Structure formats: structure tokens, C-alpha cells
């Protein structure tokens, strides 16, 4: 299913060089609103660099990135965009609740929002536990909760399901779909092609090159394959051929 409304993100001829290496060679793409877009590709394909550019924290060589109608990194986006990095960005020596109260104060979110997001990410029984006593998956959910404090219009998530067991992964995708149903836009990166089945639209990236943009159904139709790993390999072979 594609969204005919305005795009949440527009990337135009984006070029990024890092340490003398061209990571993104002039990529252009758009991401629709109120949907889940999967940014998929192997490690080292440029996914995190692209996400950093969208967040406005990556130096770009040329091109442009527009987010919710504003230049990436614009100060007015701070309250409308949530970013969850692959490494949990929370304080290990504070409890779940203490972390969220701290970040709520920074975001200007009401105190009552803290307990709301704790329940949303299913950490109610662990709210008073120190983060250094949590599992990796639980720490990731604390990071997600901090990003949800301001009720963001756009949520950017870098490999959020890495290291999670199947049950937690299922529950997290259910949460993502609920957020999209409420009008949020989600951009989710992963190196696991099977995650594509949970997304409304897909962006397949390899070595900084956008190989495919469309729905999972369109990907399967183009490659004549129901297996997502095989579909990705087919797209790569088509590109190289």
C-alpha cells in the first residue's frame, strides 16, 4: 500500500564523503507520511549515514534533505522527530523512570507522559530498575520510550530489532504499526531482509546505491520470488547485469 499524501522526507541528489571515501554517491528518494518504510541493506551499505543525514547530524558534500517540510536538522524539528540509535542512548546508572523523567524535562513533555510511554514499550514492571540491570533488548526499549516522549510525527530507528528474541521482535513491530495507524511516520533500518514483510514501503540500499524503492508486493512481482533474501539477491544481480 502506498500513500498518496505528502512525503515526510525528501532526499535529493545526496552526496556524502567520509574520510576520503564516497559513502553516498548522489542518492534521491522520498518517504511517505503515516507509513512504515524499511531501509534495508547489508552492513556497510550506507544506511546509518543516510539516517544521520536525515537527522541533520551528518556533514553532507552536496544535495539536500528535507524533513517535514524543513531542512534536515532545523531546530523546529527537535520536538517532532524522534531518533533511536543502534546503541541505546540512556544513562546506565539511572532507573527506567529516572531516565525518562530526565529526557521528558529536556523535551518539555509533561510528567504524566513518562508513565504512558513506559506502558507503551511494556516496561511497567521494570520502571524502577536501573538500566545497567536490564537486558540489551530492554535497554533498546528504554531508548525507544525516550524518543516517544514528545509524540513525534517522525520516528527514525536504526536497527531497532537487532538482538531481540522473536516474541519481543513481534511485539515491537506491533507497536510500530500502532504508531503508524495513529499518524506517525516510521523509518526503520535493518540488515535482515525478512523484516521487509512488516513494512509498507521498502528502500533497498547496497554500497550507497538505491537499488529498489516500492512495496514488498512490487519487489516480489519484479523478482518473481516470495523469498525476500532471494528477491534482494535478484535485485543485486539485475543491477550488476
Task: Say what each PLM segment does.
Residues 55:
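Helix-to-loop junction immediately C-terminal to a conserved catalytic motif
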Residues 155-159:
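Catalytic Walker B motif of ABC-type/P-loop ATPase nucleotide-binding domains
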Residues 101, 105, 111-127:
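Conserved ABC ATPase "signature" region
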Residues 130-134:
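Conserved ABC ATPase signature
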Residues 62-73, 77-79:
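Conserved ABC transporter NBD signature motif
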Amino acid at each position: 500500500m502506498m500513500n498518496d499524501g505528502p512525503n515526510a522526507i525528501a532526499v535529493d541528489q545526496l552526496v556524502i564523503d567520509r574520510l576520503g571515501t564516497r559513502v553516498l554517491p548522489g542518492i534521491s528518494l522520498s518517504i511517505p507520511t503515516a507509513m512504515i518504510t524499511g531501509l534495508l541493506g547489508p552492513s556497510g551499505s550506507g544506511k546509518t549515514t543516510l539516517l544521520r543525514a536525515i537527522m541533520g547530524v551528518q556533514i553532507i558534500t552536496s544535495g539536500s534533505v528535507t524533513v517535514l517540510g524543513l531542512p534536515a536538522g532545523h531546530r523546529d524539528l527537535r520536538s517532532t522527530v524522534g531518533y533511536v540509535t543502534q546503541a541505546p542512548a540512556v544513562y546506565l546508572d539511572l532507573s527506567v523512570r529516572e531516565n525518562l523523567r530526565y529526557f521528558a524535562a529536556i523535551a518539555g513533555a509533561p510528567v504524566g507522559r513518562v508513565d504512558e510511554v513506559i506502558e507503551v514499550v511494556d516496561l511497567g514492571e521494570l520502571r524502577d530498575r536501573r538500566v545497567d540491570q536490564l537486558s540489551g533488548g530492554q535497554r533498546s526499549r528504554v531508548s525507544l520510550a525516550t524518543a516517544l516522549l514528545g509524540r513525534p510525527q517522525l520516528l527514525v530507528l536504526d536497527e531497532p530489532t537487532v538482538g531481540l528474541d522473536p516474541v519481543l521482535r513481534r511485539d515491537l513491530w506491533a507497536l510500530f504499526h500502532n504508531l503508524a495507524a495513529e499518524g506517525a511516520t516510521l523509518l526503520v533500518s535493518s540488515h535482515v531482509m525478512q523484516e521487509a514483510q512488516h513494512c509498507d514501503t521498502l528502500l533497498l540500499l547496497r554500497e550507497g546505491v538505491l537499488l529498489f524503492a516500492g512495496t514488498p508486493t512490487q519487489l516480489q512481482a519484479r523478482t518473481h520470488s516470495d523469498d525476500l533474501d532471494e528477491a534482494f539477491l535478484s535485485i543485486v544481480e539485475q543491477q550488476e547485469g
